[in-house]
């Protein structure tokens, strides 16, 4: 199957290009039209011979304007109050309606998936409760990570992202801090799988977060 890459910003699309030979790549950062031109994007990839697409990297939602027929279809399906997840679901539905399959980054490069088990050191507690909190937060479509500080304090990720959450934890003088990050239960992991990497680890170390727990197989480990 000929797979094309729709590349947003960040490390993930760069890593994928290093690991996977894509039939065609479209860099959304240099795409000359607004991202509302969904039909044009789809036609470009199909004309290049792509039978499936991998969507990877961050995209500025503010560029979703000047809708063409495909963009209008996506906007109407998602609804006027749609969050990022609903918009992505509608985008996937459009591509699939046009006969283009969607492949996740973790599918085209399975080694990126966070493996089960303890990667370094030793784990002396059951991480289930922290992961449950992270999933509950994700179910509210707010964030994907929580940090347990000391005995009773929990910090929750918001729209500012995981690194901002970690910085907030650095302001808490607790001896023990643990980060938990999990996929949102409702999210389509083909296009929206949570990521982590050296930047996450460095930020955590600086903030005094000594233990990092990531949901196995449902998060991507970058540059590790």
Predicted segment positions?
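Redox-cofactor binding/interface segments in oxidoreductases and associated redox assembly factors
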Residues: 5, 55-56, 181, 214
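N-terminal glycine-/serine-/threonine-rich phosphate-binding loop
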Residues: 1-47
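Feature captures the catalytic cores and cofactor-binding loops of soluble hydro-lyases/lyases
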Residues: 29, 33-50, 67-80, 164-224
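A short acidic, amphipathic alpha-helical/loop segment
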Residues: 13-19, 54, 203, 223-224
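Hydrophobic beta-strand scaffold residues
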Residues: 23, 101-102, 211
């Amino acid at each position: 199957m000929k797979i094309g890459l729709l590349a947003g910003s960040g490390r993930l699309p760069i890593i994928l290009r290093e690991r996977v030979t894509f039939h065609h790549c479209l860099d959304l950062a240099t795409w000359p039209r607004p991202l509302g031109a969904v039909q044009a994007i789809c036609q470009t990839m199909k004309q290049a011979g792509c039978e499936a697409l991998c969507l990877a990297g961050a995209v500025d939602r503010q560029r979703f304007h000047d809708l063409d027929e495909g963009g209008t279809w996506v906007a109407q399906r998602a609804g006027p109050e749609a969050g990022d997840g609903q918009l992505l679901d509608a985008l996937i539905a459009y591509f699939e309606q046009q006969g283009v399959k969607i492949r996740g980054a973790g599918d085209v490069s399975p080694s990126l998936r966070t493996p089960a088990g303890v990667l370094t050191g030793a784990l002396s507690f059951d991480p289930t409760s922290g992961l449950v909190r992270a999933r509950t937060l994700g179910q509210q479509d707010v964030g994907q990570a929580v940090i347990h500080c000391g005995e009773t304090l929990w910090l929750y990720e918001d729209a500012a992202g995981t690194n901002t959450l970690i910085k907030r934890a650095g302001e808490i003088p607790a001896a023990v801090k643990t980060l938990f990050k999990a996929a949102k239960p409702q999210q389509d992991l083909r296009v929206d799988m949570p990521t982590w990497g050296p930047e996450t680890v460095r930020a955590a170390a600086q903030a005094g977060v000594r233990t990092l727990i990531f949901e196995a197989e449902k998060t991507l480990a970058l540059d590790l």
